Amino acid sequence: MHRLTRDDIEQAASLVYQVMPATAQYAWPLLAERLACSVWVKHENHTPTGAFKVRGGITFMHWLKRMHPEVKGIVSATRGNHGQSVALAARALGLRALIVVPQGNSPEKNNAMRGFGGEVVEHGRDFDEAREEAARLAQLHGLYLVPPFHTELVKGVATYALELFSAAPDLDTVYVPIGCGSGICGVIAARDALGLKTE
């Protein structure tokens, strides 16, 4: 992955803001009092899917349509938020979205993916088996296989960190939940692009 610039992230933000507004970040005084430091919370639960990953889905699908205009649809494996993200973004661009989840996946997540236009296929005991099936279906149906981690996903995710650092540039530390790593990579990319020293 190449180092993202501020311009890269701002261009990604312009795509994201066609679908959703920036999300809020608030200082939480009671939590700050308890921890004896200033605390800011970035409210990515206020996105259309309720998670930051929607930003990466938007930028990835725009990249895909630019780089592979012949693509008619995508397939990806997920347990939820990534699937909602790519389903929403694919539908907005007129692409089919086939989402493979492990058997026994959360019915709420599956229904949310369907609600955003995804065709949900349950396969396998875990994410790895679902991912293998997604690769097979990509070949079978001529769909583009969307990976769980990609530079374009990170570029979109970095937009939430750009918003946070623009609102609160003097943060000492940012805590980020980690799954496949797009969230933490997006925060690091935005921090570095802005020349900040935040840990």
Sequence positions of predicted segments:
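PLP-dependent amino-acid enzyme catalytic core
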Residues: M1-E199
